[in-house]
Amino acid sequence: MAQEERSIIVSVIIPHHNNKQILVDCLDSLHQSTYKNFEIIVVDNASSDNSINDVRSNYPDITIIQSLKNLGYAGGCNLGAIDAKGEYLFFLNN
């Protein structure tokens, strides 16, 4: 069943600034989860290392929100929460 066809229960929101490898490890771990009723939102806090473009290419199912300035962890969480579709919000700090 496609993700759009089922009700999303959990929105996983990950504010991100540079450090591609930690983000990739986090995303790989989430994709290996047996629980599948969730969406992933990555909020890019003005990364300068081009990491978000690599993530966009390799994880097409992830929602990416790009901020032109670094909003910090709390600001990134708030920005991600605006687009979240889940009944519950789960915030990760990579």
Residue locations for each model-derived region?
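Short aromatic/hydrophobic "clamp" motif used to bind/position activated sugar donors
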Residues: 89
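Acidic helix N-cap motif at the loop->helix transition within catalytic regions
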Residues: 24, 49-57
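A conserved acidic beta->alpha catalytic loop
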Residues: 29, 44-52, 69
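Active-site acidic Asp-centered loop
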Residues: 45, 92-94
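Glycine-rich, basic loop-to-helix element that forms the pyrophosphate-binding segment
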Residues: 67-84
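Short loop->beta transition adjacent to catalytic acidic/histidine clusters or analogous donor-positioning motifs
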Residues: 8-10, 31-42, 62-63
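N-proximal low-complexity "stem/linker" segments adjacent to membrane-targeting elements
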Residues: 1-32
